[in-house]
Regions:
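Short N-terminal signal/transit or membrane-insertion segments
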Residues: 1-2, 60
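A cross-kingdom feature marking charged/low-complexity
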Residues: 38, 43-66
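Short, well-ordered alpha-helical segments
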Residues: 2-36
Length: 66
């Protein structure tokens, strides 16, 4: 039987995909076996009427080894 643990992260990037990749990369520094990331919300940062970046809140799921 596998045990899955979930942590919540907030990550930023120039695109949503970039933000998520940054979040996975940072989470992978402290946890192994990341299997899934679930997005809770996305915020766009706006400056001078243009979107200049994204902030994403996501849950990162990973398998705990015995």
């Amino acid at each position: 039987m596998s045990i899955v643990k979930i942590i919540e992260v907030v990550c930023e990037g120039k695109s949503i995909e970039d933000a998520l990749n940054n979040g996975v990369r940072e989470a992978a520094k402290t946890v192994k076996n990341i299997k899934q990331i679930d997005v809770k919300w996305v915020h766009a940062k706006v400056e001078h009427e243009k979107i200049v970046g994204y902030r994403v809140n996501a849950k990162v799921s990973f398998v705990i080894e015995h």
